[in-house]
Amino acid sequence: MSLSSKQKATVKDFFSKMSTRSDDIGAEALSRLVAVYPQTKSYFSHWKDASPGSAPVRKHGITTMGGVYDAVGKIDDLKGGLLSLSELHAFMLRVDPVNFKLLAHCMLVCMSMIFPEEFTPQVHVAVDKFLAQLALALAEKYR
């Protein structure tokens, strides 16, 4: 399940290309998450409006995508590089780690919609593996 050096380069290249639309991808992915998996709204009960496309959902989606971009920069050591985020999600926020995989799926859908030509099968495989490793790194402190 590890990424080859070619796949790491593919991930970095693709994320570089989509940087102009990363906010849109993050906002749309989180909107899809709360729409398709409504149980995830329970993590955002403190928001006035947790409906798809609302300002808080959009803002948190952008923040989340920023974290994914940070992870791209730490692609060679995701577990070590994301340890504090793993601790935050495990001990403070108490997010069920299955939700990382659900959000990753929503991100893949959005990436493929917004960048249909760039989202080749090779990019799909590399980004999917990267997001799976990212989810695993975020779940590190749950063990």
Swiss-Prot record:
Hb 2 is a heterotetramer of two alpha-2 and two beta-2 chains. GO terms for molecular function: haptoglobin binding; heme binding; iron ion binding; organic acid binding; oxygen binding; oxygen carrier activity; peroxidase activity. This is Hemoglobin subunit alpha-2. InterPro entries: Globin, Globin-like_sf, Globin/Proto, Hemoglobin_a-typ, Hemoglobin_oxygen_transport, Hemoglobin_pi. The keyword Hydrolase does not apply. PROSITE patterns: GLOBIN (PS01033). Red blood cells. It comes from Gadus morhua. The keyword Acetylation applies. Belongs to the globin family. O2 binds at residue 60.
